[in-house]
Amino acid sequence: MTTTMEYHNPVLLHPTVDGLDIKPDGIYVDVTFGGGGHSKEILRRLGPNGKLFAFDQDEDALANALPDERFTLINENFRFIKRFLRFHGIKAVDGILADLGVSSHQFDVPERGFSTRFDAELDMRMSQKNDLNAYRVVNEYEEQDLRRVFFDYGELKNAPVLARTIVEARHHRPIKTTDELKEVLKKYLPEKVRNKILAQIYQAIRIEVNQEMDVLKEFIEQSLEILKPGGRFSVISYHSLEDRLVKRFIKNGMFEGEPERDFYGNFSVPFKTIGKLIVPDDEEIKINNRARSAKLRIAEKI
């Protein structure tokens, strides 16, 4: 049986949970349950009357459900956090934790198609219930849409040529696997930067398949609605696109533009930042390579 640590090494475990400033009788939400590492630590700090709700859209995570009467696991995308908490009678919470991106488990299961290390069918769905997968993005998207995906989500300067090359190749036969995709794009993968560019290409397709940026925006906006005044928001991001959204919303209460002003002309913002940006130390990165790009931001609702 797969253990929690094999499934997912919790990144920045103690700083992330410390950031929630756990109240023993509080109500908390872990929106990225995975192997349950962060949830276990939250439960350890909760008293007998505290509650923890966890979300994970990946069906594989259900095997890690914790046998604790204070704990409820919801097999849904966290973009629906408000809806499903209300279903359970919860309208306001004391803290929300999010460990964004792909779990170690998802990267390590070849058939999921997330990792550049394995050949697999083009899938990349975080939930097998979703209709859109990587095969459809690669084989059905118009050239201009592929260009947008690679430019916006992979931050690839050669997005136009990558999109054109894929469209020309699939005209002859469908691109069905990750190795076939690598073969199609091999002349744009020089050895020195091959892994970096591949990671950017995979990231771009994965974000599109799972609508990650739209999901993140919806989640952050709903989190503001359901957090109590003084409630904590503790978020780990792994790439600049995620971190930029989190940082802007914490700072301004919006993703673009200037924050609103109050009657006296002062900026009206919903959060105050708690502490500085936290990143893993060398020791954690040595133990858990996934932590190398992690950035933790903590905020408190005003």
UniProtKB/Swiss-Prot annotation:
It comes from the Bacteria. Its EC number is 2.1.1.199. S-adenosyl-L-methionine binds at residues 36-38, 56, 84, 99, 106. It is found in: Cytoplasm. GO terms for biological process: rRNA base methylation. It catalyses: cytidine(1402) in 16S rRNA + S-adenosyl-L-methionine = N(4)-methylcytidine(1402) in 16S rRNA + S-adenosyl-L-homocysteine + H(+). GO terms for cellular component: cytoplasm. It holds the Pfam family Methyltransf_5. InterPro entries: RsmH, SAM-dep_MeTrfase_MraW_recog, SAM-dependent_MTases_sf. It is an enzyme of class 2 (transferase). Keywords: Cytoplasm, Methyltransferase, rRNA processing, S-adenosyl-L-methionine, Transferase. GO terms for molecular function: rRNA (cytosine-N4-)-methyltransferase activity. Specifically methylates the N4 position of cytidine in position 1402 (C1402) of 16S rRNA. NCBIfam families: 16S rRNA (cytosine(1402)-N(4))-methyltransferase RsmH. PANTHER family: 12S RRNA N4-METHYLCYTIDINE METHYLTRANSFERASE (PTHR11265:SF0), S-ADENOSYL-METHYLTRANSFERASE MRAW (PTHR11265). Belongs to the methyltransferase superfamily. RsmH family. This is Ribosomal RNA small subunit methyltransferase H. The lineage of its organism: Bacteria, Pseudomonadati, Bacteroidota, Flavobacteriia, Flavobacteriales.
